[in-house]
């Protein structure tokens, strides 16, 4: 069975859509962020990044994707930075190695929202690591959004869709019948 991979910016709705997809298809969800917390012995991601830096976190994501490359029949809910690594200067760059693994793992679905909508959604969310130390979230989005678009096999704009409608569209695209109808 094919794996479904959800990518998109922080606050796009990947976790909500992945849960709805799972409910409709009975395919289990694996979250790269949840696996990262598990792999670090329960350390929340913001704390891990604070202690070890973003580069170490991006390495951890890569090792998680390596472990998942033979997965079969999962919905992979990816953290917002999954497509990126840091260069020598600490700038975000496309991670060819992670994108290659994601393409091996399954079909990549980009869940899209507008920049303003995303900025509003994540303002003051204490459960997420602070991105402002790198640069403003808006400028991060301006760099990341074209990369998500380029990486995806399928793009879905969530602005006017409920999570259930989004899940139905993804299942239709993949050719899996929804179990909740």
UniProtKB/Swiss-Prot annotation:
Chain sites annotated for binding ATP: 11-16, 128
Localization terms from the record: Cytoplasm
Residues bound to Mg(2+): 15
Presence of the UniProt keyword Ribonucleoprotein in the record: no
One annotated GO biological process: aromatic amino acid family biosynthetic process
Principal subcellular localisation of the protein: cytoplasm
Reported cofactor(s): Mg(2+)
GO molecular function, one term: ATP binding
GO CC annotation, single: cytosol
Binding positions for substrate per the UniProt entry: 33, 58, 80, 144
Metabolic or biological pathway: Metabolic intermediate biosynthesis; chorismate biosynthesis; chorismate from D-erythrose 4-phosphate and phosphoenolpyruvate: step 5/7
Domain of life per record: Bacteria
Catalytic reaction annotation: shikimate + ATP = 3-phosphoshikimate + ADP + H(+)
Free-text comment on the cofactor: Binds 1 Mg(2+) ion per subunit.
InterPro entries, A to Z: P-loop_NTPase, Shikimate/glucono_kinase, Shikimate_kinase/TSH1
E.C. number(s) listed in UniProt: 2.7.1.71
Keywords tagged on the record: Amino-acid biosynthesis, Aromatic amino acid biosynthesis, ATP-binding, Cytoplasm, Kinase, Magnesium, Metal-binding, Nucleotide-binding, Transferase
PANTHER family: SHIKIMATE KINASE, SHIKIMATE KINASE 1, CHLOROPLASTIC
UniProt family annotation: Belongs to the shikimate kinase family.
Role according to the record: Catalyzes the specific phosphorylation of the 3-hydroxyl group of shikimic acid using ATP as a cosubstrate.
Assembly, per entry: Monomer.
Name of the protein in its database record: Shikimate kinase
């Amino acid at each position: 069975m094919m794996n479904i991979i959800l990518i998109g910016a922080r606050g796009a709705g990947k976790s909500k859509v992945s849960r709805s997809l799972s409910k409709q298809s009975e395919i289990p969800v694996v979250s790269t962020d949840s696996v990262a917390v598990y792999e670090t012995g329960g350390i929340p991601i913001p704390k891990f990044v604070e202690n070890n830096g973003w580069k170490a976190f991006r390495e951890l994501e890569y090792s998680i994707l390596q472990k998942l490359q033979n997965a079969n029949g999962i919905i992979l809910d990816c953290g917002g930075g999954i497509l990126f690594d840091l260069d020598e200067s600490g700038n975000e760059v496309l991670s060819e190695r992670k994108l290659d693994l994601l393409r091996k793992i399954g079909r990549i679905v980009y869940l899209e929202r507008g920049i303003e909508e995303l900025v509003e959604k994540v303002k003051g969310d204490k459960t997420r690591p602070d991105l402002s130390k790198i640069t403003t979230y808006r400028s991060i989005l301006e760099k990341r959004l074209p990369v998500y678009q380029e990486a995806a096999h399928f793009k879905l704009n969530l602005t006017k869709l409920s999570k259930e409608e989004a899940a139905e569209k993804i299942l239709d695209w993949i050719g899996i019948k929804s179990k909740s109808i």
